Amino acid sequence: MKMKNLEKAIILSLMLSGVGSSSAMALEWGLNNSGTTFDISEASKSYSVHSTTDKPMGIINTNNGILTANDIVLEVRSDSNEAAGFFNDGGSVYTGKNMEITVVGGSGNFMVNGIVNQSTGANNASKFTAGNIKMDLTGYGSELYGIINGSHGINGNNAVDFKAGNITIEANNDGNLIGI
């Protein structure tokens, strides 16, 4: 993304500590769209999440959510857990322009994911459409994936659809598994 686009960006910097769900693995996020229609296409956006204990995600779009965006910059860092840049699930639809994603995962038996586009709900198709995507992924754990695009629901017919322009992925996982 060019600097002139970043100058127009609305910066939402969320340094979260302890915000999350009541589940065993709490989540922290920059933007969570669950089951609603959300349009942020008028300006570029930047989301930053740094977690010392929980599982951070830059953007979560779930439960048949519809998210429309302009250019997006995501920076997600985890000190001690897995991390994901963009998580699209449950029949949700994302339509956007260019993305820059930086994800740094914690050490141990944890995954680092740039983009996860999946559908685990019954009879739902998750769709992800973007322009050019640039990722910088660093892991210190067992697995690192640039893009996971798959349906693994157990009830009904599930599907995924992933479309993007040019994709550039730079990855380092401390000598462990890298899947692009």
Where are these regions (language model features)?
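Gram-negative bacterial Sec-dependent N-terminal signal peptides
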Residues: 1-26
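Surface-exposed loop/turn motifs in large extracellular/passenger domains
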Residues: 27-180
